[in-house]
Amino acid sequence: MAAANVSVVIPARNAAETLAEAIESLQAQTLTGWEAVVVEDGSTDETAELARALARTDSRIVVVDGAGRGVSAARNAGIERARYPLLAFLDADDLIRPTLYEHATARLERDAALAGVHCGWARLAPGGEIVDAVPAKIEGDLFTEFARHCLFPIHACVVRTDLVRSAGAFDERLTTCEDWDLWLRVTRYGRPFAAIQAVLALYRMRPRSASLDAPRLLADGLGVIAQARRPDPRVQGPVAHERGLASDDLAVNGLNHACWTAGLAIGSGVDPEPLLDAVRSTAPIPAEPLVMAGCLFASTVLPRCLTPADWTGLADELRDPIDSFLTSAEEVARLPGLASRVWRRLEEKILAASPRGVTTRIGTSAALDIEVTEPLADIEVADGVERLVCRIALEGEPFGVLGLPACDGLLPGAVLADAIAGELGWSLLTRFLTGSTLPSLALRDRGTHLEVVRGSTPVGRVPPGTQLGPAVLNGPVGWAVFLQELFDRPEWPPEWFYHPPRPSRHGRPRSEATVELSGEISPMTPAPANPAVVMTLGGAPLGLVTVQCRDGGVAPERLVAHAVRSAGVELALVAVREALVGRPLRSGGALRARLQAAAEREGAETAAPHELVLARRQPLDIGGPASRSYALPVGAASELLESARATDEPVVKDGSFHTHVRYAPELIPALPVVPAPSRAPLRRRLLARARVRRTSSATQVTRELPILMYHRVDESGAEALARYRITPARFEEHLRYLRDEGFRSVTFGELGEAMRLRRPLPGRCVLVTFDDGCADFLEHAQPLLAQYGFTATLFVVTDRVGATNSWDAAYGDVVELLDWDALRELTAAGVAIGSHSATHPYLTSLSSADVVREAARSRAAIARELGVAPVALAYPYGDVDAIVRHLAGGCGYPYAVTTEGRHAALTDNRLALPRIEVPGWFTALDLADLLNGPRL
């Protein structure tokens, strides 16, 4: 590749105020080999003179006359003049940071298959503040992304020149969305893009920008969205996406784009409702409230050149026009409750972005500022507040945002601490270990990799070139160091915590069935065969662990190994909660000493007056939602009690009425015959089943699990719901492909085991799910599943079992649903049954009490009718947010699935597992693309 390898096209019209600064950002590039083609496009100010003056001082700059034909024609003139194989665009009022072209060209030189490289970007406010930073994370084939929205601004990408030319360059008929249209055509080839996460491109906010013309933006954008769903004759040569995408999502993406332009109109003081005329549909639109809220949130402030933090002062002013627009959008979408769902998401975004230190309330949502190193007490909230946006800070710096319900005017400190540990625990632990343990680590060059050592003990490996910094602790190395610190065994390599060396018999024998892991662990002698041991950490019970007894006892090393294998990453979360949350990081001693001090503290009372306490579920399953703390609405107490009775789960009641409901995972049993030690009191008894574990001899492993989502298997049905219906022949084609490619079925329990230990599933795995519980599952799907050796999870709407799918009535597709007898037959045949709620509502539109009623009533019905609790919850329509997710865990669901279309990672939240929808028209080849395509 030539030394000067990037041609940078800069259209300039009346840009005398900003052109020099844009050129300066180009001249500051660490890659010096570039040329700038400045296309002067009929300016009436001094732009032309300035451009020529700049060219006289730098031979890499050339000036071309654009004749005032518009920005697309100007860029095309620059493309025609470009001499180099790599191409970039830079508007005359935007900026790039110094390393953009160096990093991008290096990636393109290393990988000839790449079409381009894009980077993170941010907006530059008039006052010079950098706001709305968007790191670049998405890589690979980006056609599907651009078919929905414009992924990045034009100057945040370096692309191969020949691809832009063969794609037809810019469409000069477009006055807006011309860059989106070009990227869509370039990505139609299917060649991958790489991403540089760092923010290296700055987009200047301008009050009179063409990108703020709402009607024009809507018309042009809808044209781009539609073009993505049909062939494009402008693109030359063979392309991967010749026919474009299916058109079934055209309406929903059009509505999303209408929300973006509506925000521009609202921010400009213009009535946005006429914009909806362009996206009216004859059928209901499956709207995306989160995307709609995101569009309104991002675009409404742009006409005023404001930042997201300014929303706090705008919310009251703009509530009426936003309300009016969303009410009309709900009518257009024919989707009751849509307006409230979008508003809730918008409230969350506004509160998360509002200035810290200001307690803000919008509707039923309120913001709280939480400093993680300060003690966490119970927080009383104002009447009417149901949803809390908790803005978490660590030593005064923003650290994360959590969404939690405020049930009956209270957020218990224990629930908040547990949520912080559950959502942000690993980041907090890494920060602590960086200060306490990182200095003891060193790197050794082993040729193919670098070995991380602590003293003389290897603790992991990292790629060549890795620097010894905090990032080293974000993975297996950090996990190994944590275990060494927790058990005070810095000389143990990681594998010894799972398979210890020859056990010692040193230490005072003990017979108690409780082991505090931060203290001295002595042999258990004598011990019954395979005793159930209560493991505690910092005085907090983790759960029951069944240990293997040898020679009448259990050695300390084996107790450590059992704890690590049984609790997995829950050890880290509990250690963070008990030793770090609510305490200063820079004082207080080492992690183990902090936990020992916590173990000596007195425990809380079992139940406060008039408090209904639900005790620990599934004590043998450590680390899932059953290990978290929840506050639940007292308005749903009867449904929660019904669910507990149906599943034979213990309840602690106090008084004849209740003012609060709490799920307390610390209430774990001891064995009836064994007394509990004084410093880790046990408050209840509970029987539990052991898990059944599968093994596989396969050498291949699955690190990211595809969870497939089907609905119906039948020959006919309403055309509007064709994507949710697959014919038996095509479904058999899918199963045959899975069998022939060596896939095997796994259960949610197996996935949970892998997630707890962060260890891949053995073999090539898939998890098959069906939503709704249609009667055709028994007739068509189950026989084929059995024939090809697969199992499935069936999610049923319990109030509609034996009836019809009333939620699809608007589409004219009345389908019979399985009755309880059929579900019992399927359960006996090995089909796992999950909940799809009681009535199939949009859960985010409901109050907290109604969410719990839906989830708990459905769970109780399945347990009562089938004799087993549902294995998981499938959120109806995939409609979920942080509040719904939290409440689902509190109702007792160990897993929950969404409709987010990607593979499930071992680090995913168990209550927000993604699923890959399989449309009815997908062939086995299409399924192969789904399974083998981009993972995250």
Residue spans of the language-model regions?
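Cysteine/selenocysteine-centered motifs that mediate thiol-based redox chemistry or coordinate metal-sulfur cofactors
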Residues: 425-511, 568-650
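C-terminal subregions of glycosyltransferases and related glycan-biosynthesis enzymes
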Residues: 207-363, 369-378, 389-450, 455, ...
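A short, conserved beta-to-alpha structural element at the edge of catalytic cores
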Residues: 203, 789-810
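Short, basic/aromatic recognition patches
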Residues: 356-389, 498-532
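Nucleotide-sugar donor-binding/catalytic module of glycosyltransferases
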Residues: 1-223
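Acidic (Asp/Glu)-rich catalytic clusters
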Residues: 783-789, 816-834
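Membrane-proximal basic amphipathic "stem/tether" segments
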Residues: 297-350, 648, 652-704, 920-936
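C-terminal active-site subregion of NodB/CE4 polysaccharide deacetylases
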Residues: 684-769, 774-777, 845-936
